[in-house]
């Protein structure tokens, strides 16, 4: 069984701030750091650290993407399916406040240049029963899902960032949804408690397994037979950046 993480690769510019910048405000940051990032990359690193052999597919810029490839290789992620394109690598501007909370502005760059030709080549390497991990920061997600379904791969979707494109994807092909309450509300088109959202998702996607993350309240898993509630192990928060991606990687790592 192989795991394919088909997702974004970003250069994260992280600014530590006293508070998030308000409209019209100019403010000095307390610190500036540069990290590897992107939901796809974060999930691949978490998968690799969970002990899983993972192949990452996606795209970076020829001039500024080597840093990200080196980061993936360091933890054992296979990078031969990543394309290097004559465009800028995707990047993010992240504000992180004193409490460790963040807000993020994305530039898609090479992440939005994934082509069907590349996808066809990547999918030739995988087969029945392999896992595909997806989020919503790259182009051609719907086509990737279609090809994975034809291969009888197990499709895991983290519908983040949540936007109108999600509803154009063949969501009935998804085997696992991993999402937070905000994403669940948007996907269902309804407000509600965690339990209510879980039931709505199960009605909408009866064949899928649902993992709903609830922040400091933990998470809930639901499939056709059972519901499992998992509380959190409390720690002092340093930075919430990539927390959801790390959860996704280790959850799937536990299945594989």
Language model segments and positions:
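Glycine-rich phosphate/adenosyl-contacting loop at the front of the ribokinase-like
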Residues: 1-59, 65-70, 237
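Conserved phosphate-binding/catalytic region of the ribokinase-like
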Residues: 3-4, 164, 194-256
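Short, conserved phosphate/pyrophosphate- and ester-handling motifs at nucleotide-, phospho-/glycolipid
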Residues: 47, 180, 244
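Conserved phosphate-binding/catalytic loop of the ribokinase/pfkB sugar-kinase fold
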Residues: 56, 82-84, 94-131
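A glycine-rich helix N-cap at a beta->alpha junction
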Residues: 71-86
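Short gly/ser/thr-rich secondary-structure transition/capping motifs
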Residues: 76, 112-117, 156-162
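Conserved beta-alpha-beta core of the PfkB/ribokinase-like small-molecule kinase fold
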Residues: 131-195, 217-219
């Amino acid at each position: 069984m192989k795991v394919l993480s088909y997702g974004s690769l970003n250069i994260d510019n992280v600014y530590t701030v006293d508070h998030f910048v308000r409209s019209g405000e100019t403010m000095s940051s307390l610190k500036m750091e540069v990290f590897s990032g992107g939901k796809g990359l974060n999930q691949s690193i978490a998968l690799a650290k969970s002990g899983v052999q993972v192949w990452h597919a996606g795209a970076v810029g020829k001039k500024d993407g080597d840093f990200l490839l080196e980061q993936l290789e360091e933890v054992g992620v296979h990078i031969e399916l990543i394309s290097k394109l004559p465009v800028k690598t995707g990047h993010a501007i992240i504000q992180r406040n004193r409490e460790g909370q963040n807000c993020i502005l994305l530039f898609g760059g090479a992440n939005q240049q994934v082509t069907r030709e590349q996808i066809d080549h990547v999918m030739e390497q995988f087969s029945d029963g392999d896992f595909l991990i997806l989020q919503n920061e790259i182009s051609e997600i719907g086509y990737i899902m279609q090809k994975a379904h034809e291969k009888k791969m197990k499709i895991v979707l983290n519908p983040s960032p949540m936007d109108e494109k999600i509803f154009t994807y063949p969501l009935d092909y998804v085997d696992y949804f991993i999402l937070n309450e905000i994403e669940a509300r948007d996907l269902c088109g309804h407000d509600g408690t965690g339990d209510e959202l879980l039931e709505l998702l199960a009605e909408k996607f009866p064949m899928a397994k649902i993992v709903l993350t609830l922040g400091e309240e933990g998470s809930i898993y639901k499939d056709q037979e059972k519901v499992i509630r998992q509380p959190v192990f409390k720690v002092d928060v340093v930075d919430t950046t990539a927390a959801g991606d790390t959860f996704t990687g280790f959850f799937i790592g536990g299945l594989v």
